[in-house]
Each structure stands twice: as structure tokens, then as C-alpha cells.
Amino acid sequence: MANLDWTKLGFGYRKTNTILTCYYKDGKWGPVESCTDDNISISAFAGTLHYSIECFEGLKAFRGADGKVRLFRPDENAKRLQRSAAYIGIAAPSEELFIEMCIRVVKENIDFLPPYGSNASMYLRPTLIGINPQLGVKSSTECLFMMLCAPVGAYTGGTLQPSYVVISRDYDRAAPNGTGSFKLGSNYAASLYSYNLAHKLGYEAVLYLDPLQHKFIDEFNSSNFFAIRDNSYITPQSDTILPSITNKSLETVARELGMTVERRPVPVEELSTFEEVGECGTAVVITPVYQIDDKPTLESPEVTPYYFGSKEQCGPKSLKLYKMIRGIQDGEIEDPFNWCITL
């Protein structure tokens, strides 16, 4: 095992043993290759560099309480990558190839898989890019699929420390009938200006509204939105939201725990009725939110604040959902949904 302080990894890049690559050319995928160098060589005219012809995924592998290694729902990531690739008109790996490369990259980098109990995991970043040289705006005919990995700590340090968020009314993450529901790098680029501005103002995340009317909640800059009221788990229904696998899993767990699940448009004004609010995604599972500020513009001094629970700790129902997901991932509790692939 690598000589690392597993409890202080943070969420960032760290060199591992190998990355995996697989090229698509002449209508077929080639062999999967291991590379010890995580630099790649592509044409300066590659479509990915000029027209953002790329999509990616994020998932995790965990070393369990029983010593087994588990991948959490890689089949869902494979399907979502295929959906993103189809939208930008490029070839996508089959679900079988996707999962094969997930398993292989974990095995080749097993020394970097954090131990059980460290609140850390191995983050996998499947990445698909268009690589053939081109000048015109068109879908790529040649692609490179890469399976990358890195050991990571919890995105927010593993403390479930509630966050301070602002609503963006003057900037949108996505466009109506646009790419918001696909996992494309360009969507994240679109959120950087408003996120950087909000960060300078002391906020930890940005909550975006529907881009057509700015009346309904969409999602955060890098994660989905959920809320809890009474015994209901509530999350937005919108065509401009990325379909989060974590959110989908939380909905299933909520039902298992006897909660009512509501996926529907969520008006901004409804924030005042929620007991708990959180961000959810692969990197965090759940980050509770203790305050959301609504402003006419990000830099406006006029503020309508909404408060949820404690500034110091996660709400009880969010915590219960979090513990069940993490328990399944770590092999501490039974996986009744057959979500995990055990290596």
C-alpha cells in the first residue's frame, strides 16, 4: 500500500501507477492499454480542444469492512456516459468495456485504494474525448476513452459540515433545451465565473435556477439539490439538471426508509418550508446546507436568507440517508439493491 496519510488526502490530483486508454478508430474500439505516464499526445487540431467534444463520468471504489473492494453503481455511469456521447455525436464504450476498465484500473492501482475506516476512497474519472484533427464544427470520428483514478478524501473533509450557499439570478449554468442534463465539461466551465464570484463573496456553492423563468430550483454548481420536509424527500424535476446517480440512490434509500419521494418543480419560495437542504453527488454523497441567500444579483447587498437546521451539524434525516449509502459502499450493511460490483 502506498505510503500516504489516508486521513488527509483531500480531493485532488495524485499520481498513481497507471491510467488506461482505449482508442476508437475506423468504426471500432481497439485494445485497452495501461500507461504509466498520465500525459497523452493528441493533435492540436483535435475537436475536444476547440469545440468541447468530450464527456466524462465520476464514480468511486471502496475498500470495505470485510476486506472486499466495491465499485458503486458503475453500470449507471456507463449508461450516462453513453447518453452524453450520443448527444455530441461520438462513439461510446459499451457497458461491458466501461466496467472492465473500471475493474482493471482499480486492480492496477490497488496500492492507492485507501484502507477501510479512513473516510477515503478511490475516485475514478472515465473520460471520453474526440481526437481526430478538424477545423469545422462537427462530431469527432476518432475518440480516446481513458480510465483515470486517484485516491481522494471526502470532498468537504468528511465532517458533513453544513455549507453557505447563494442563489444565482444573474448567471445561468445551462440554457433552456440545452446541454444541462448531460455530463459535459462545457457545463462546468459555464458555472466557473459565477462560482468564482460567489466564492470571493464568502459562499461555498452556487444554486442555479431554471434558465427560462428563474422561478424554480435547478441544481448547484457541481451537485444536485434535495430538501426534506416532514417525511418527504424533495428534489427538482428539470430538463436542465444532470441526472445524478447519487440523487437517484438517495431517492431509493428514502423510500426504503419509509419516506415519500417527490421529484417535481420546486419554486424558490418553497425554501422557507424546508427543514433540511443538501447538495448530493459522487464526491460528497451529501453536503448539508445551513443557509441559502437569495439576491437580485450576486453582488447585490439586498439579501433574503433561508435557514435550515444547524450551522454546526447535518440534519437527522439527511444523516440517516448518508449513513445508509456509505454503509452500502463500505460493506457495513447489506446491499439490498445489488448496486455494488465486488472485485
PLM features: residue spans?
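Extended Lys/Arg-rich, glycine-bearing segments that form polyanion-binding/interaction patches
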Residues: 5, 77, 82, 88-201, ...
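Short glycine-rich loop/turn motifs
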Residues: 17-19, 56, 142-144, 162-163, ...
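Short acidic-glycine loop/turn motifs at beta-strand connectors
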Residues: 21-29, 55, 62-67, 74, ...
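Short, Gly/Pro- and small/polar-rich lid/capping loops
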Residues: 1-36
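Flexible, glycine/charged-enriched surface loops at secondary-structure junctions
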Residues: 94-96, 112-121, 206-209, 260-267, ...
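N-terminal cap/recognition module
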Residues: 34-78
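Conserved catalytic-core subdomain
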Residues: 2-16, 165, 212, 216-343
